[in-house]
Amino acid sequence: MSKKILLPLLLLSVAAFAASGRYWNTGLGGTTMKFLSMQASPRSAALSGAGVASPVRLSELTRNPLAATAVSQAEIGFSQIVFGDAGADNFVSIYYGLPLNDLFVLSMGLEFLGYGDIEGRDEEGFETDEYAAYAWAAQAGIGNHGRPFAWSLQARFAYQAIDDESTLGILADAGASYRVNRFVAFGATVTNFGYVTDSEYDGEHEAAPMALQAGITGTVPVGELLHLESMWDVHLSADIYRRADMEDFEWRFGGEVSYREFIALRAGYALRPETEDAISAGIGITFGSCVFDYGYSPRPALGSGNHYLGVGYRF
């Protein structure tokens, strides 16, 4: 069964690597719908985007298809980003996961990004009428769970409008991971692979924000190593990431100290060639059927940062 699933994932990965030119090496600023690649979940933001091989929260679903493989019971929830200075007015994502049986998981997600009135300027810099901008995306997917080899596939429809210009996207995500044992896991994903309608901003074609990410996560059972009756664990992740319009790869590192599923303290650091590096942080709490998450991702260039809030309910 795993070979039958691995083959299409492998073919999709090869196709993604083979998508050269305008689709993969677009150059700086060559992609549209970049909101589909920004961090959306508190946990991912706190880990600076690391941890693709070991998702824990279903809220990671819209950026990491492998999040569906971590589902053990039905869950619904939402996440919101509170932007710092010079950010959007609102970003909300809603997610849902449902185990169909002992093997498969159905997942769905919806997200909306909205800006308030934006001051218009003409080619000479003079003020014109205000305009609005917004974007949304809906997705559905299927994956497996409870297996050493995990996989997930997602389909997404996206829409973006800026003033009187609009763009449609029909995209797909795929991911596969392998847990060697309870201490080490490897994973890789292809996200936003597909087609977007032409939108001629400034006379330049813009492609989908296709991205590749691969990583490894190691778990250190602190309690066992110290021969303590403790359930504290340390999870360390290292990932490599590249979006189609990036000239260089990003290196992402994240750490999570957790006590069972009750509490998790998180921090991350990313080496981003095109932007400033910074340390992110966050916390996660599980209380019965309720899941609460918070993450903070700084934006040094603007002297502020984004706050990520998430609430989920398992049933």
Describe every region a protein language model picked out.
Residues 10-19:
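Hydrophobic h-region of N-terminal signal peptides that target proteins for export
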Residues 19-315:
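Subset of outer-membrane beta-barrel
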Residues 9-10, 40:
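A periodicity- and composition-biased signal for non-globular, repetitive helical segments
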Residues 7-9, 95:
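Intrinsically disordered and other compositionally biased segments
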Residues 1-5:
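Positively charged n-region of N-terminal signal peptides that target proteins for export
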